[in-house]
Amino acid sequence: MQIREAILSDYKEMMSLYNDFVGEDRYSKLDNDSFSDVLNSPNNFVFVAQEQQKIVGFATFSVRRVIRYKNPIAELDELYVIPEYRKRGVGKTLMEQVLKKAKELNCYRVFIESQYKHEIGHKFYEALGFKNYGYHFIKDL
């Protein structure tokens, strides 16, 4: 298995995985240009796990500055592994790459948002050393 940064030609396969991950309606507006913008942004990072020319998982995160911290923070935006590759270390390897890159960027902390019912994910993140920190609130605009 290879972990690498995503490239523009990964768009079609990545969007198929996104649709499996969250459903088509949520990301139907994410087009090739938007994907390109994310890949070209200095504050966004997309890693893919590839096995025999097939993308089997991905992790995306962003880096930003906030007033309360001297150094930037990183936030995991998405982590997804296709079902047949789960429990094989793919997610852990993707997260190790995210953490390595965040450290290279001198990030102070990595934040992860997770749905409160996603107990399998919570156990996964806790096994990687993350702690439940609080609540996230959202409002669609």
Spans of model-derived segments:
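Conserved acetyl-CoA-binding loop-helix of GNAT-fold acetyltransferases
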Residues: 87-100, 127
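A short, internal acetyl-CoA/4′-phosphopantetheine-binding micro-motif in the GNAT/acyltransferase core
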Residues: 79-86
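Conserved beta-strand in the GNAT
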Residues: 48, 54-63, 80
